[in-house]
Each structure stands twice: as structure tokens, then as C-alpha cells.
């Protein structure tokens, strides 16, 4: 979309019948996505909390993996502390923000909340001091539910993207369509970690920190 690369003009269009129809279809699609995603996420939580005390892989179904700590560049404080250098090294980008009016919100069920709380209390054992959980009928059934939802979700996610893109084309250079959507695009100055490292490695190091290692849970698809 060519309009994604330019600032909006601040104008809001009046909605046409075509735009109202797209909006209605988009909300219906999002309603379906929420329903399927809830089924998928619930199955995932049940797999993850099968061992109530520890993080455990389930043979052939799901596993945990360690993610290396990522570097974090404190752009906000660097800009405050060194505005002149920021100005010299920065470049302009368009920051888009697309939102749907009368959008749908997902409400977590009590079962969902309880499983999340249970997972919060689980512990990760660094040493491989226990085996993976063996598959059983219940676990295979849960995995099948997750897989079914995973496959079912994809065409609706694609449809959602296509409908959103249709609205963006109709918005064009404007800021949005009244009661339908908003697509704000503003210029913003940006700086990269690599640009600062090339300019002054010692200064850059003061604004680069290492985050905490993360544990990621993955279900086999």
C-alpha cells in the first residue's frame, strides 16, 4: 500500500455503504478469530500446566526452550542525554497506527485465569533432572484440539488482513473513516543501535544492556 509510506492529512471521511459492509464483515471475522483463538490458547494452557509444579516437555507434543538474552538499546534516554548526536544520526520513519472502531474485546474465562495463575507458580529446573512426560490419550486429544484450531484460524487471519487492507486503500491519504476505522501515520525520528556503535562504541555501550534469558513454550505443529 503506497499510502503506508506517507503521513496522513488529518481528515476523516464519511462512511459509504461499501465501507460499512466491510466493517461489519471484519467484525464478524474478528469474532470468529476470538472464538477459535480461545480454544487454541486454552488447549495450550492445559498442555503447559499438565505438570502443576514444574516446566515439563511432553513427548512429541510440546517443549520448552531457552532463548538467549537480547541486547536492549535505551533510545529514549540517549535522545534526552545527547540530542545533538541523536539529530545527526537519526532518520525519519512513518509510524502507522491502524485501529477499528467499535472493535471487539476478548474476555478471559475463569478457567483460563486459573490456568494462568497455576503456570505463574510453576518452576523451571535448569538441570535435566527429570524425563519428559509420556503421551497419553488425554494429551493427544488436547494436542489435536490445538492443531485443529491452529489450522482453522489461518484462513480467518488472512481474511482479516485482506479486509483491513481494503479499508486502508479506501482511507488513502486521510486519517480515517468516521465510525469505521482510524489509520494515523506520523513522521518520527529513529536511531539504530548499529549506527551509534559505528559513531562512538564507548558511548553506545552506556545505553546498551543485556536482558534476562527467556523460556519459551512451543507446541509442535
Regions from the language model: what does each represent?
Residues 2-28, 34-221:
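Extended, charge-rich alpha-helical segments
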